[in-house]
Amino acid sequence: MPVDDFSLSANSISGESTLVYQDVARQVQKTKGIRIINFGIGQPDLPTFARIREAAKKSLDEGFTGYTSAYGIDELRQKIAEHLSSKYESVRKEEVIVTPGAKTALYLAFLLYINPGDEVIIFDPSFYSYAEVVKMLGGVPVYVKMKFNESTGFSLNLSELESKINKKTKMIVLNNPHNPTGMVFDPIEIEKLMEITKEKKVLLLSDEIYDYFIYEGKMKSVLEDPDWRDYVIYVNGFSKTFSMTGWRLGYVVAKEKVIKKMAEIAANIYTCPTSFAQKGALAAFESFDEVKEMISLFKKRRDIMYEELKKIKGIQVHKSQGAFYMFPFIGEILKKANLSVKDFSLKLIEEKGVTTIPGEVFPLEVGKDFVRLSFAVKEDDIREGIKRMKEFIDMLMTP
């Protein structure tokens, strides 16, 4: 059999992701010598906090380098449960599994429930991996278009969501705060979504990885519902909040029976999360002072990016309330320049050395008139990058 005769599952994945544009940027920097301003990266630009690094080093020096339980170490599971219980409804250690990154947590959740032909409702736009994994498992992504208004941002469009729930619907995916839009959804909307999910007897997979990145308003977590065990699969992790993207640690919270089944799957896929990384994560909970400082810094950066984007003619932008992304509408510019959003992003890299992520990466249709910019970069780079972006757009608009 030819080595390139891949499975249906493998062939169902497109491979289009934010990383493609990072590769283009690296090539441009190498060949043209342009200093890249990277608004495409989806991670904090700060190093992992010192006490976390030191805890991991200490565990290495003490020889904590073997396998752990597939569930993760008990101390970390307990600390996660205590932390969430202090904010929301009660969570027990037995209702937590630690995973190698939040993406793995999402994969376990989909793998546990999705059979071929099952439908999964995903808001459009959304993080691209949701739909890719659903397709890989033979499921069918069903998209609900979010509504955009420059003054109020994006809303969930729950009436359309209700109309798309049928006997094949297995799950609804929620991401709050939201990538790529930077929205923190109205708590009333989230409450209504939770009610719909329970009423229709479908699962709610809630990805709350950006839960500390909130600049205005209040976020409502699905774990605030006393009945969360009946329908919620909750995903979070350490990558964003503690600037630990390369450490690859996430976790799932769900009913104990669900966690047990996930652990069985985990033991046969990756055995366990990295031992010494878990010791580092345990130290993360000792203080949130650095987190608060980072959020304050990112809020200032957000304000700068918003004000600079507002100066560009033809752009509509809502000031994001959460995560670390701005998602401006550039549909008028694309139309006048006769460009797709993908071509816009590629040309912006090639000609000005500025990396953005075209909204079409976040399927399916809504994003085709938007680009995503991360403000997890230095203030001077934000100003310089938006200046270059304005020059590029002015050039496109010149007859």
UniProtKB/Swiss-Prot annotation:
Gene3D superfamilies membership: Aspartate Aminotransferase, domain 1 (3.90.1150.10), Type I PLP-dependent aspartate aminotransferase-like (Major domain) (3.40.640.10)
Binding site for L-aspartate: G42, N179, R372
GO MF, one annotated term: L-aspartate:2-oxoglutarate aminotransferase activity
InterPro entries documented for this protein: Aminotransferase_I/II_large, AspAT/PAT-like, NHTrfase_class1_PyrdxlP-BS, PyrdxlP-dep_Trfase, PyrdxlP-dep_Trfase_major, PyrdxlP-dep_Trfase_small
Record's GO cellular component terms: cytoplasm
Record localization: Cytoplasm
Listed PROSITE patterns: AA_TRANSFER_CLASS_1
Main location: cytoplasm
Claim: Ribosomal protein is one of the keywords in the record: no
EC top class named in words: transferase
List of residues that carry N6-(pyridoxal phosphate)lysine: K240
Chain segments annotated as transmembrane: none
Catalytic activity: L-aspartate + 2-oxoglutarate = oxaloacetate + L-glutamate
Swiss-Prot/TrEMBL GO biological process terms: amino acid metabolic process; biosynthetic process
EC numbers for this chain: 2.6.1.1
Keyword Cytoplasm: yes
A Pfam family that the UniProt record links to this protein: Aminotran_1_2
Keyword annotations of the record: Aminotransferase, Cytoplasm, Pyridoxal phosphate, Transferase
Cofactor entry: pyridoxal 5'-phosphate
Family that this chain belongs to: Belongs to the class-I pyridoxal-phosphate-dependent aminotransferase family.
Quaternary structure annotation from Swiss-Prot or TrEMBL: Homodimer.
Stated name of the protein: Aspartate aminotransferase
The organism of origin for this protein: Sulfurisphaera tokodaii (strain DSM 16993 / JCM 10545 / NBRC 100140 / 7)
